[in-house]
Curated annotation (Swiss-Prot):
Keyword Cell membrane: yes
Alphabetical UniProt keywords: Cell membrane, Membrane, Transmembrane, Transmembrane helix
Pfam families according to UniProt: DUF515 (PF04415)
Listed InterPro entries: DUF515
Membrane association type: Multi-pass membrane protein
GO cellular component: plasma membrane
Main location: membrane
Organism: Methanocaldococcus jannaschii (strain ATCC 43067 / DSM 2661 / JAL-1 / JCM 10045 / NBRC 100440)
Protein name: Uncharacterized protein MJ0835
Transmembrane feature ranges: 23-43, 251-271
Superkingdom as given in the UniProt entry: Archaea
Location within or outside the cell: Cell membrane
Length: 377
């Protein structure tokens, strides 16, 4: 007979085994699900983090590229700009971007220093830069320099002031080769007439700034104006080569000038003299009286006609020259010796003056001009 109690016990044991296995399976499934969920969450977090880092890196790259564009604002066509931008685009992290930016800053700083040095040299030379091979060679070497120390050594190796003075002195010598006795000199806002020897003397003492402002014009290259004035406006007749100062009657200075030629304006010469004598004679109680008179008159009319007649050989040239030669000089001398001044004499002067003073002379009435003679040949 079958033991029912054993059968029941076996069934109960079987039920417990099945129940325990199901529970384990469920637990395993649950663990797998949880682990999977955690893995998914972790993956999403990591992905989000990586995405954020990527966005941050891209933003940093954009900002860095903008910084590069600002750095190279003065040099938009510099090929180094594209090199730095490419390095930034290839960077894998912010540290690499910062390294590129730092490198670019150093490059721009050195480039600015280099250009500043070149501009300073060109500024010092001014208009003389194109005339100096030394200056151009120096600028070329600086443009190729790789460090500030190299540039500083290049600047120390040259005497820029000496080079500029040498160029200007050569220009002075070239102008003085014209052979003129006088030159119109403009320097630092002042002007004067100087001889060749005076210029050669003073050029050694003029500063570099004065030499740069120097302008020398041979008198032979100045414009000439013709002025008719009275002796009262000038005093003595000035002669060729005399340096004069021209003023207006109100005392304001107009310009310096040099007499190119001067003339006494005469149309005729007249002179008259009369002489009378009388005498009383007593003889044997009788008196006698006698008188006599004489007169001399001299008149030379149409003096310009005499000149023209001499030109066409109607009158002897040597005699006319002997008679009237240096008339103005002799007139000055006789006036000095006698202290008699003829205020009715007029002078015709041809004067060399600076080009920019021509309008000032033309617009003033010759009657309002006063001439002061500064020196004579």
């Amino acid at each position: 007979m079958v033991d029912t109690s054993k059968i029941k016990a076996l069934k109960e044991k079987s039920r417990r085994t099945v129940k325990s296995g199901s529970l384990k399976f469920i637990l395993i499934i649950l663990v797998v699900v949880i682990v999977g969920l955690l893995a998914f969450i972790a993956y999403n977090e990591i992905s989000n983090l990586q995405f954020q880092e990527k966005i941050t890196l891209e933003n940093q790259k954009k900002a860095a590229i903008e910084s590069i564009n600002q750095m190279f604002a003065k040099y938009p066509n510099d090929p180094q700009k594209l090199i730095y931008i490419n390095k930034i685009q290839m960077a894998n992290n912010i540290e690499e971007i910062n390294e590129v930016l730092e490198e670019a800053k150093k490059y721009i700083s050195f480039k600015n220093y280099k250009i500043e040095a070149i501009n300073q040299i060109k500024s010092m030379y001014g208009e003389y830069y194109s005339l100096s091979l030394s200056a151009q060679e120096l600028v070329h070497k600086i443009s190729l320099a790789q460090s500030t120390e190299e540039i500083e050594n290049l600047l120390k190796s040259v005497d820029i002031e000496k080079d500029i003075r040498s160029i200007i002195e050569k220009q002075i010598d070239y102008v003085l080769a014209s052979g003129d006795k006088y030159y119109y000199v403009e320097i630092n806002g002042k002007s004067m007439f100087m001889t060749r020897d005076e210029i050669l003397k003073y050029k050694k003492f003029w500063t570099l700034s004065e030499l740069k402002s120097l302008k020398i014009t041979p008198v032979s290259q100045l414009n000439k104006v013709a002025i008719e004035i009275s002796a009262k406006q000038c005093g003595k007749l000035p002669h060729k080569g005399d340096i004069i100062s021209i003023y207006s009657k109100d005392g304001s200075f107009i310009t310096y000038g040099i007499i190119d030629s001067s003339y006494v304006i005469l149309s005729s010469i007249s002179y008259s003299e009369s002489k009378s004598t009388s005498s009383n004679i007593n003889e044997l109680g009788e008196s006698y009286s006698s008188s006599s008179s004489s007169s001399i008159s001299y008149s030379l009319n149409n003096l310009p006609g005499i000149l023209h007649a001499t030109v066409i050989d109607r009158l002897d040239y040597d005699k006319i020259k002997k008679m009237f030669g240096e008339y103005g000089k002799k007139l000055n001398e006789i006036e000095d010796d006698t202290q008699i001044f003829d205020e009715n004499v007029n002078y015709f002067l041809i004067i060399s003056i600076p080009d920019d003073k021509i309008p000032d002379i033309i617009q003033i009435d010759p009657k309002d001009i006063v001439i002061v003679i500064k020196s004579k040949e």
